Each structure stands twice: as structure tokens, then as C-alpha cells.
């Protein structure tokens, strides 16, 4: 065997061809008996080697001359069989077949992989195959395109079938491969159902399919034009066989132009479809009546937006706020300018005359309703094709296209030529027999070249107008937030949801290559932070100096006035520990001076340090993207706190549906967010400090602590200035200004932005909106959603914030948010109304949503964010998110345990009662009442009883009952305040004495001596035993008091029953006494 036959490519090609021909064995056997191609003679192996080498050299020479690509001879042979069926010796018996020495009837033929298409004269009517094998077989010396193999169907985020399953079984492959026509894309193979998808759930794929089905008339497959050209090429091949090679070269050149590799090619081929061409298409699809209704509805909607802004400006007294009046006036002027620009573009696009413009502008004055104008826009119509060709060419084109396309493609691309009455009656309901997601989600905008062969076009007027308006809004290469609000409001009038608009925006931008550029985005705002820090430097120095003076005055005055008392307390404490002689100095003039000066210095230090920390600048300000798909809108989220070191600010918003747009999260001041999120440290610290002061009050320095509690209450300057809550509030306000600078600089793209935040994050957004109003930056913010905002309701600020938002402004509050009700008001809010705990009234355009059913407290906002987002209308994939498991720090656990042990020890020490623990005489101290002492002793005895395990008691009972009784008497005493057993014993003694007196009286009567004697003998003193004291069980109730169940019932004795006297039986109970 020669070296050429041992080449690896030849062996692999042979194996591939053998497997391919084996799959269609029956078809090969039938033609082997009837076709004359087996009559060709076969030569020896040497001839095969010579012919093989010569053919290979000719191919390489020809490739150097004209650069044409080779094609597998197998494809040509199969095309001859699938074509007209005429036998040809040139095409049937190649030199390689003649000299192979292998019987074709027994084994599959190994054709020459280097056989050129120009070496043989093709049979008229043959079809060229465009499978991936033909591309991979061409040996051009570079990287070969390898087909992707998968065991299941995979869909992309648009719902398109990206990769079909590769069936390795020969039987299944024989069933699927012959049904695929030449040139058909792999997206239509095995696409009759929804298979595995990379999207979050199958529901998303089905939703995308239903939404995209409504706009299929505006889009077409990317390969449709190629298929139509290939069908026209086959007609030319049938008529003129001599021009086959030229047509093949032309088709190959077209394939080269269509296939673009971003890693191999330097310049991307230019696509003729753009925004302007699509605008011309949509304009031609509308009638005059629909155009006037379209323009009139947009005019009315724009006037409504201007009216709402004017109503908002009238909510406040403009005369008393001149600066605010100027800002609101500029906002109204800018809104009017935007309206003029949008309407002028629309008039020019649709060709509206000046007289018609005047008529349309007066529609709002006549109180025309939108529902009346939009009735004609909610229909599906069948219109004449404006790009129709001649009738003869149309019929030929339809016939050839029908031959070359599968039934699924015919339904997807040619169904417009035969309008369906069911589809026209219910345009929004897709048919059950339509092809699924893979074949109905194309990626190319409708091209007139693709529909020239159609007589009628079925269009949905509403979606055509939405597409036209969307492209009009993007005409200046910027997407204003007011334009998107106008688009969504208009879609609601046409009975479309915002989610469908998001799907449509994504589809249009993907088709026209209009994605938002992300290369120029800035993720770290160092420049803006530096500028803000410089502008704030002088203000910070002034505030620090003021706080220093104020702190020195507060502590200096309080320390100077109370210096004698403080000095006396210090002297008393020192004398307690054995240091004497300091009383005269500390209570004199010298001590007073020392205390006053020290208090002044300490106050100045506390004030300066606290204000410096509070006026600090923002050090961390970054953006963390969660969904970055280059969409035309952005959702920016701001978290209120972080839980632990491993927490992520994107986690509460991680369940938002990606179709809503790009989603970024603001990562700012992580140390401060972690300190807030770990615990409610502010309230807990205040309570803990109070308990420590009480603990210290029972120690040696009792007099000192008690004497300086008043100046400490007056001098909580440090806590007021630099507590974590106040510092976080001021830092959030500063971060909002930096966010405003970022949005003004368009660092996140020239697109509408939706802001979502909770707790401190909502305060960041609120500060950003006010700063945008001050900077007169309009058209940036589309929607705002605030939850649990720690901000005071000031009407001026609310009006400023609402004026820069074009869409919805939602305030989420909770009635059970005690955190804001107590802490925020105590720290900064005073008695003013807070946004996070009450509704906002008397301000136009603000929605109030009560979140109490989802939020029990302030710390539940983070956990309930997916539910709240779903409540306000944002699509979410799940109502819960999975927390990040954080590893416990051993040092932190050890520190917490030590702190708990110290607190327990201090409380135990405080609870111990000492008889002589101070210099105050005992008779001067307040005394407790007797009943208080008794209750405390009973409680302590009950605790001692509870400390004894039950198992030990049972064991002691079994071993030695006497010892157990002694232990029980010592450790288990009755917790009741009254000894019921003693009372019962005294009662029995009284009854016995009364009984003896009665017997003596009876003995004095005559005739009854014998009976009395017999009774005395029977009831002698030696035989009489009073009832013993009942054993009292230990208390079982948790409060250790058993007044209701104490004692036992007293039953009558035997001698109480006198049959002669028939005395009445009486029962006595201890509780009745």
C-alpha cells in the first residue's frame, strides 16, 4: 500500500463514508442491481495509487491558480441519484472506482476525498449539499470547522434551538438524516417538542415562544434568503448544465460571505438591514387610518405625561421656594422639548402634512379617549404585498421554494400567502400544530427580498406600531427613559404587558445589532469619589471644629458645675479600696479645677473624633453585574446591609428574570453594611451599656458611678455623633451623590435605569434623585422602588425626587417596622413622619404599597425582596433565594462565649446580697417588706428543688428511705406560704377535745352507765389516735406556689356515725376554713 493511502485523513474519510453508506444499505443494494454503474471494470492496486496521486497533484495546482474549493465526490454521486436519475459514466464510474479492486455490491465504495468538482461533468438537475461534512472535508491548510455534538437539544437565552441532539445509533440516524433537505439548518431537526434548555425553567422557553410567535411576521430566518437563492440556482442548473460550475462558485462565494468568524476574519461583513430600512418596512405595512390613529394616540399620551408633571409641580407652594420653582420650571421645559422631538420624528417618518399636524395636536382639547383611537390598532389584517414581483416569477418561486423546504419551514415562512381565518380571528393564540421554539424564533428582521414571492402578508397592526415606535425612540442613538415610559404606556393601551415589551426589545436589538455597548462602562467610580472628597474637605473641617467646641462646652460646663460632687465620689471610692487623704484635695478648689479642665479636654476630643468619623467620605463604590446581556434597559439595585463576610450584595435580587433587562448591584462601604447586618448593634449596645452600669453600681465604685450618672446622661455627645446608625445614614447620603454623578456621566450606558433598594440602600437612591434634580439631569431614571426608607418625609424633597422619574415611584412601608419607628426617630428623625413606616400623601404620582404581610420587621426586608419585587410587577424566577453558608470564625465564637460568661458572672455577683457592702449604715438603707422576703425565699427554695435530678431522688428512695426523707426535708421544703399540715393537726385536736366533752356529758345521765363504760372501753385514750399530718408533695407548678392544691380532704371518723341519734353527716375541708 502506498503512502498516500496510509494518510490519516484518507482513512478517516473512508470510515466516515463507509458508515454513511451503510446506513442507507437497502437503497444502495436496489440501485446496485438496476444501475449500470457496476459494469465498469476494476483494475489492480497500482493503478489506484497512480490515479490517486495524480488527482491529488491536480487539485493542489488548481487551488493555487483560482482558489476554488473542492467538494467530496460522494456528495456529487448522491446528488446524481437524488436528481434526475440519468446514468452517466463520468459521474458514476470515477477513476478511483474503476481501479479500486473492490466489489461495490459487497462492500461500500471508498471514493477519492481529493476529487475536485471540476474533474467531472455534473449531471443536469443535481443538487449541491451544504452539510457540515462538505465544509470539514475541504483541506485548505487552516483550522477546520468541527460540528458540535450533544446528546440533547440545547436552547439559548432567546429560546432558539442552538444545538440539536446527535443520534449515534445508525437506525435513528437513518430516520432523521434523509428527512433533512439540502441546505436546511440544524434548528429544524427533532424540534417538535421542548427539550432540555439552558434557561432557568421550561416555562421561560414556552413564554418566549408564545411572545415571539406574535411578532414572527416582522422577522425571518437567517438562512431563508440562502435557501431561495439555492432554489433559483437549481432551476438554472436544469436549464443549462454547462453553467453549473459558475453557479457553484457563486454559491460558494455567498456561503463565504455569510459565514463570519470573529476570530479568523478581520472585518465583519456589512449587513444591509438597519434601523432606517426597518422603519421603511413598517411604514409600508400601515394604512392611512392606522397611521392617524397611531400618531393621535402618541400625542395624547405625551400630553398626559406633561400634565402629570405639571400637577406634581402644583403640589407645593412655589412662591416660598424659589430655587425649587426654578428647578421644576426647567423640568417642565425639558419635558416639552422631548415631546416636540418625538412627535416631529414621527410626523416626518409617516409623512404627515402641516394641516394634519394641527388637527392631531387638537385631539387632546376635544377629550378624545385612547381606547377609541386604538380600536383599529388591535387587529390582524391581510394586506397586499408592496414588494410583490411579477405573477409568473412569483409562481415559479413558490413552487421551487416548496420543493426545497420542509413542511415545518413552509408553515413558518409561506403561511402568509394563504391567510388562515382562525388565525385572523384570534391573532394572539398560536396554533397547536405550529413548529416549536427552534424554528419560530429567527434572528433576522423581515427583508423585502424574502417576501417578493408572496401575494398577501398577515400582519399584527399593534406589534407593527410598537416596533415602529421603538425604532423611532432609538433614532438618536440614545434611549430616553421618558421614551420607554411612553412605549410601555402605549403597549398597555394595546393590551400588551411590560414583559412582552422586554422580550420584543431584546429580539429587535439582537436582530439589528443594536445592543447597548458595554466596553465603555466604568465599574469603579474612583474619579467621582475623589471629586466629592475634595469638595467636602472644607465642610468637614468646619463641622469637626464646631463639634470640638461643642463637646468641650458640654462636658466642661457639666464637669465644672458638678466638680465637687464628682470629686467627693472619687474620694469615697478611693477610700473604699484603702487610699485615704484625697478627700480634702478633690473636694477643694484644686480638685474642682482638675475635674473641669479634664472634662473640657475629654469633651473636645470626643466631639472632634466623632464628627470626623461621621463626616467621612465614601471609600468603596463599585458595580457588580448579575445579568450583563447588553440590553437597552438597566436595573440597578442597592442593598441595605450584608450578612457576614461571605455575603453578596446581589443575592437578594438574584431571582430576577433576565428578560427584565441587565441587572447591576451597587457595592459600597462593605464594612459599614456588615456592621449593620450582623445584629441590631445600636439598640443592643445601648441596653448592654445600661446593664453594665447597673452591674458596676454594685461594685466598689458605687458612689463614683452614681454621682457621675447625671453628667454622663448630659454628655452622650460621642454616641450622638458617631454611632453606627448615624454614620451609615450620612455615608448613604454621600454615596447617593456619587451615584448621581455616575448616571450623569453615562458610565452605565445611555439607557433607561430602574432603581431598586431597601433600608439604607433606599436612602442612597433617594439622595441620588434629589441630586439629579439639583443638577437638572432628566431622562435617566425610568422607575424607582424604595422599601423601608430611613428618611424623613419632606414635601420639597419628595417633589424633587418624583420630578426626575418618568415612570413609577413606589414607596414600600411596613406598619410593624419598630426599628425605624424607634431607632431612626431617636437618632435623627425626631417626631417627624418616616417614609419606611407610613404612606406618602399629598404628592402626585407616588404609589404606596403596604408590605406588612411580607415584612414583620426591618430586618426581614432582605429575605422578602423576591416576594416584594413580584408584588410590584417585576418578574422573578423564584420567591426565595439560597443564602451563602458562612464558615464560623473560631476566634469570634470564643470571644462571644467569653463575653456571655462575663455578663453572667457579673449578674450573678449583682444578685448576691451582701449585708455590709458599703459605708452606709444598715439602719439608713431601705428595708423590704416581710412578704417580699418570704416570696424571695420560697422562690429560692423552689429553684433548689428543681436543681435536684429526679433520677437521683428515685435511687435514694430505693436504697434508703430514711435518708431520702431527711434529704427531702432539707432540699425540698414546701413552697407554700402557710403550713396546711399544722393547721390540720390543730383541727383534729380540737375535734378530739369536743368529743371528750360530749362523752362526759353522756356519762352523767342515769341508765346509760354500761353503755358509756363499754364505749369508753372501746374508745379509750390509749386506742385513740388523731389523724397524722399528711405528706405534702413537692411543688410541681412552674411558679412554685400551690395554694389551690394544698392540704387534703378531711373525712368523718367512725364514731361520728350514731345510728340512734341519726346525726347528720358533715364533711369539712381545709380550704373552707
Swiss-Prot record:
UniProt key word Membrane: yes
Modified residues annotated as Phosphoserine in this record: 435, 1037
Enzyme Commission numbers on file: 3.1.1.-
Transmembrane spans: 292-312, 457-477, 553-573, 577-597, 818-838
Residue ranges with Pro residues bias: 1027-1037
Record's bilayer topology term: Multi-pass membrane protein
Biased composition (Low complexity): 233-249
Extent of motif APM2-interacting WQEMP motif: 143-147
Biased composition (Basic and acidic residues): 54-81, 101-121
The keyword Protein biosynthesis appears for this protein: no
Amino acid composition bias (Polar residues), ranges on this chain: 404-427
Predominant location category: Golgi
Annotated InterPro entries: AB_hydrolase_fold, DUF726
Gene Ontology biological process terms, A to Z: clathrin-coated vesicle cargo loading
Annotated Pfam families: DUF726
Record note on quaternary structure: Interacts with RPP0. Interacts with APM2.
Additional remark text: Present with 1110 molecules/cell in log phase SD medium.
Stated family: Belongs to the TMCO4 family.
Function in brief: Probable lipase that recruits the AP-1-related (AP-1R) complex to membranes via interaction with APM2. The AP-1R complex is an adapter protein complex that mediates of cargo protein SNC1 sorting in clathrin-coated vesicles.
Protein's UniProt name: Probable lipase MIL1
Organism, as annotated: Saccharomyces cerevisiae (strain ATCC 204508 / S288c) (Baker's yeast)
Taxonomic classification: Eukaryota, Fungi, Dikarya, Ascomycota, Saccharomycotina
Amino acid at each position: 500500500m502506498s503512502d498516500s493511502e496510509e494518510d490519516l485523513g484518507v482513512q478517516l474519510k473512508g470510515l466516515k463514508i463507509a458508515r454513511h453508506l451503510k446506513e442507507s444499505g437497502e437503497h444502495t443494494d436496489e440501485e446496485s442491481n438496476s444501475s449500470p454503474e457496476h459494469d465498469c471494470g476494476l483494475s489492480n492496486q497500482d493503478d489506484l495509487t497512480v490515479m490517486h496521486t495524480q488527482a491529488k497533484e491536480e487539485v493542489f495546482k488548481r487551488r493555487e491558480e483560482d482558489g476554488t474549493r473542492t467538494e467530496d465526490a460522494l456528495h456529487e454521486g448522491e446528488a446524481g441519484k437524488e436528481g434526475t436519475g440519468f446514468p452517466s459514466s463520468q459521474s458514476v464510474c470515477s477513476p478511483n472506482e474503476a481501479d479500486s479492486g473492490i466489489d461495490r455490491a459487497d462492500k461500500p465504495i471508498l471514493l477519492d476525498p481529493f476529487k475536485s468538482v471540476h474533474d467531472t461533468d455534473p449531471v443536469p438537475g443535481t443538487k449541491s449539499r451544504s452539510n457540515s461534512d462538505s465544509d470539514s472535508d475541504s483541506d485548505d491548510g487552516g483550522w477546520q470547522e468541527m460540528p458540535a455534538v450533544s446528546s440533547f437539544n440545547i436552547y439559548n437565552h432567546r429560546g432558539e434551538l442552538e444545538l440539536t441532539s446527535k443520534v449515534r445509533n445508525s437506525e435513528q440516524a437513518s430516520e432523521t438524516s434523509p428527512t433533512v433537505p439540502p441546505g436546511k439548518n440544524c434548528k429544524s431537526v427533532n424540534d417538535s417538542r421542548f427539550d432540555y434548555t439552558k434557561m432557568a425553567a421550561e416555562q421561560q422557553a414556552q413564554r418566549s415562544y408564545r411572545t415571539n410567535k406574535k411578532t414572527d411576521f416582522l422577522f425571518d430566518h437567517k438562512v431563508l434568503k440562502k435557501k431561495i437563492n439555492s432554489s433559483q440556482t437549481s432551476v438554472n442548473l436544469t436549464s443549462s448544465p454547462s453553467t453549473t460550475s459558475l453557479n457553484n462558485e457563486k454559491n460558494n462565494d455567498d456561503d463565504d460571505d455569510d459565514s463570519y468568524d470573529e476570530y479568523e476574519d478581520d472585518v465583519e461583513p456589512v449587513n444591509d438591514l438597519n434601523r432606517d430600512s426597518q422603519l421603511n418596512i413598517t411604514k409600508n405595512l400601515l394604512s392611512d387610518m392606522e397611521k392617524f390613529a397611531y400618531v393621535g394616540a402618541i400625542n395624547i399620551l405625551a400630553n398626559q405625561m406633561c400634565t402629570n408633571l405639571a400637577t406634581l409641580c402644583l403640589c407645593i407652594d412655589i412662591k416660598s421656594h424659589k430655587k425649587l420653582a426654578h428647578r421644576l420650571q426647567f423640568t417642565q421645559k425639558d419635558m416639552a422639548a422631548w415631546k416636540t422631538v418625538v412627535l416631529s420624528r414621527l410626523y416626518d417618518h409617516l409623512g404627515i402634512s402641516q394641516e394634519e399636524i394641527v388637527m392631531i395636536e387638537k385631539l387632546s382639547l376635544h377629550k378624545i379617549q385612547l381606547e377609541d383611537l386604538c380600536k383599529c390598532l388591535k387587529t390582524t389584517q391581510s394586506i397586499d404585498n408592496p414588494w410583490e414581483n411579477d405573477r409568473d416569477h412569483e409562481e415559479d418561486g413558490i413552487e421551487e421554494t416548496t420543493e426545497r423546504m420542509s413542511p415545518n419551514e413552509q408553515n413558518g415562512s409561506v403561511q402568509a400567502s394563504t391567510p388562515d381565518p382562525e388565525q385572523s380571528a384570534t391573532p394572539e393564540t398560536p396554533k397547536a400544530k405550529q413548529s416549536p421554539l427552534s424554528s419560530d424564533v429567527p434572528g433576522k428582521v423581515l427583508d423585502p427580498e424574502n417576501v417578493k414571492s408572496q401575494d398577501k402578508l398577515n400582519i399584527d397592526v399593534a406589534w407593527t406600531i410598537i416596533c415602529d415606535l421603538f425604532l423611532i425612540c432609538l433614532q438618536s442613538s440614545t434611549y430616553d427613559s421618558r421614551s420607554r415610559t411612553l412605549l410601555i404606556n402605549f403597549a398597555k393601551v394595546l393590551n400588551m404587558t411590560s414583559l412582552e415589551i422586554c422580550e420584543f426589545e431584546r429580539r429587535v436589538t439582537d436582530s439589528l445589532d443594536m445592543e447597548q455597548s458595554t466596553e465603555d462602562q466604568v465599574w469603579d467610580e474612583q474619579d467621582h469619589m475623589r471629586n466629592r472628597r475634595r469638595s467636602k474637605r472644607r465642610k468637614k473641617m468646619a463641622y469637626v471644629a464646631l463639634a470640638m467646641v461643642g463637646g468641650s462646652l458640654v462636658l466642661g460646663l457639666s464637669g465644672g458645675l458638678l466638680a465637687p460632687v464628682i470629686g467627693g465620689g472619687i474620694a469615697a471610692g478611693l477610700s473604699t479600696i484603702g487610699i485615704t487623704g484625697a478627700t480634702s484635695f478633690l473636694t477643694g478648689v484644686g480638685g474642682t479645677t482638675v475635674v473641669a479642665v479634664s472634662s473640657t479636654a475629654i469633651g473636645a476630643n470626643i466631639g472632634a473624633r466623632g464628627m470626623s468619623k461621621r463626616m467621612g467620605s465614601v471609600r468603596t463604590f463599585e458595580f457588580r453585574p448579575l445579568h450583563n446581556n447588553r440590553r437597552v434597559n438597566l436595573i440597578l439595585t442597592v442593598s441595605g446591609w450584608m450578612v457576614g463576610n461571605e455575603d453578596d450584595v446581589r443575592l437578594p435580587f438574584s431571582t430576577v428574570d433576565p428578560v427584565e433587562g441587565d441587572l447591576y448591584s451597587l457595592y459600597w462601604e462593605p464594612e459599614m453594611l456588615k456592621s449593620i447586618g450582623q445584629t441590631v448593634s445600636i439598640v443592643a449596645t445601648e441596653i448592654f451599656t445600661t446593664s453594665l452600669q447597673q452591674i458596676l453600681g454594685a461594685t466598689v465604685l458605687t458612689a463614683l458611678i452614681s454621682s457621675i450618672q447625671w453628667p454622663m446622661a448630659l454628655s452622650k455627645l460621642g454616641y450622638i455623633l458617631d454611632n453606627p446608625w448615624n454614620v451609615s445614614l450620612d455615608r448613604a447620603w454621600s454615596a447617593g451623590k456619587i451615584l448621581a454623578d455616575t448616571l450623569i456621566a453615562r458610565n452605565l450606558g445611555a439607557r433607561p435605569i430602574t432603581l431598586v433598594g431597601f433600608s439604607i440602600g433606599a436612602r442612597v437612591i433617594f439622595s441620588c434623585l434629589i441630586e439629579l434634580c439639583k443638577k437638572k439631569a432628566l431622562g435617566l431614571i425610568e422607575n424607582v422602588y424604595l422599601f423601608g426608607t430611613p428618611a424623613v418625609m419632606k414635601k420639597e424633597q419628595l417633589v424633587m425626587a418624583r420630578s426626575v422619574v418618568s415612570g413609577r415611584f413606589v414607596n414600600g412601608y411596613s406598619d410593624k417596622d419598630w426599628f425605624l419607628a424607634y431607632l431612626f426617630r431617636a437618632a435623627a428623625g425626631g417626631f417627624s413622619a418616616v417614609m419606611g413606616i407610613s404612606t406618602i400623601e399629598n404628592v402626585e404620582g407616588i404609589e404606596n404599597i403596604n408590605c406588612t404581610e411580607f415584612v414583620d420587621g426591618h430586618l426581614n426586608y432582605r429575605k422578602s425582596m423576591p416576594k416584594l419585587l413580584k408584588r410590584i410587577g417585576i418578574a422573578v424566577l423564584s420567591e426565595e433565594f439560597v443564602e451563602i453558608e458562612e464558615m464560623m470564625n473560631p476566634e469570634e465564637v470564643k470571644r462571644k462565649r467569653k463575653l456571655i460568661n462575663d455578663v453572667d458572672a457579673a449578674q450573678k455577683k449583682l444578685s448576691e446580697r451582701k449585708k455590709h457592702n458599703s459605708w452606709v449604715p444598715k439602719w439608713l438603707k431601705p428595708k423590704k417588706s416581710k412578704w417580699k422576703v418570704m416570696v424571695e425565699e420560697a422562690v429560692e427554695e423552689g429553684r433548689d428543688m428543681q436543681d435536684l435530678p429526679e433520677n437521683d431522688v428515685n435511687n435514694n428512695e430505693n436504697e434508703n428511705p430514711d435518708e431520702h426523707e431527711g434529704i427531702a426535708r432539707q432540699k425540698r421544703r414546701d413552697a407554700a406560704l402557710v403550713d396546711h399540715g399544722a393547721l390540720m393537726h390543730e383541727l383534729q385536736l380540737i375535734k378530739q377535745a369536743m368529743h371528750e366533752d360530749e362523752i362526759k356529758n353522756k356519762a352523767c345521765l342515769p341508765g346509760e352507765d354500761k353503755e358509756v363504760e363499754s364505749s369508753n372501753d372501746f374508745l379509750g385514750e390509749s386506742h385513740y389516735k388523731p389523724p397524722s399530718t399528711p405528706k405534702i408533695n413537692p411543688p410541681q407548678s412552674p411558679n412554685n406556689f400551690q395554694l389551690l392544691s394544698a392540704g387534703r380532704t378531711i373525712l368523718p371518723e367512725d364514731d361520728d356515725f350514731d345510728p340512734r341519734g341519726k346525726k347528720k353527716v358533715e364533711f369539712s375541708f381545709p380550704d373552707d376554713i
